[in-house]
Amino acid sequence: MTTPQISVQLYSVYGPSEADLDGTLGKLASIGFKNVEAFDFVRRVDALKASFDAYGLSSPTAHAILIEAGTATPDGLLDTPPADEVFAAAKALGVGTVIDPYVPPARWGDLASVEHSAKVLNEAAAKAAEYGLRVGYHNHDHEFTSTINGTTAYEVFAGLLDPSVVLELDLYWATAGGQDAPALLRRLGDRVVAVHVKDGPMRPGITAAHLPDDQVPAGRGDVPLVESIKAGSNISYAVVEFDKYAGDIFEGIADSYTFLADTLKG
C-alpha cells in the first residue's frame, strides 16, 4: 500500500473562495494542507498560483470537464473550455493529473454511450500527454447504479480506458451507488491513484442529482474510509471533500484532515 498524501477538493470551499480566494487558501494551509485539488481553475490561474506560492501549496490533481462539453454538473459551476486551454492552465499551475469530475447519468445507460465517453477521454489523454500531463475520471453514484450485461457501467468504462488514464474513486458516491468500496478498489488495482474522502449516513435515495445536506467529517459516517484506503494498492492522494456541509466548513475540513492524518500515520 502506498501512503497517500492528504489533499482537499476546492469545491468544498466554493463560497468562501469566491469571496476571498487568497484568504481561503491561507486557512487551508493553516489547517496543515500542503496539497489542494483545484477546480474551475482555467479562469483564475494567476490568482491560484500566487496563493499557492504564498502558502506553500501544490495542486497535483485538478478537476476539469473533458468528456461531455457543455455539461451542467450537479452544482452547475464548471465551465468547459477547450482541452488545450485546460491543459495549458494545468501545466502552469503545476498540476500533473487533470480529472474529469462528471458525466451525466444519461450517458451511462447503454454500451454505445459508455464507449463514446471512454473514447473521448482516451483522446484527451493523448492531448494531455503533449503537455506532459495525464487524465483521469472521478465518479458519482450513477455510474454504479447503471449496469451493462451484468457489469456496472463504471467497470465497463474502466475496462475501455487506455492504460495511461487513471481513476479517482469517490468513496462516498461509490458506496451510495451500492458498492463495497474496499472490494472495488481491490478489483481496480493500480488504476486508482486518488480517492475522495467524504462521509455521511448511508440511506436509501442518496444521489448526486439531489446533493445531500447531511455529510459529516471523515470517520463519523457510514463510509468504510479506513478499509478503503488500506485496500488501495496505488493511492497517492486522499482528497477531503464535502458536497454540502451544514456546519462551519473549515471546522469540518479540519476534522477530516485530523482523521486522515491519524489514519495514515497508523
Model-derived features with residue positions:
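Alpha-helix-loop-beta-strand connector modules within alpha/beta enzyme cores
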Residues: 49-68, 121-128, 154-162, 225-228
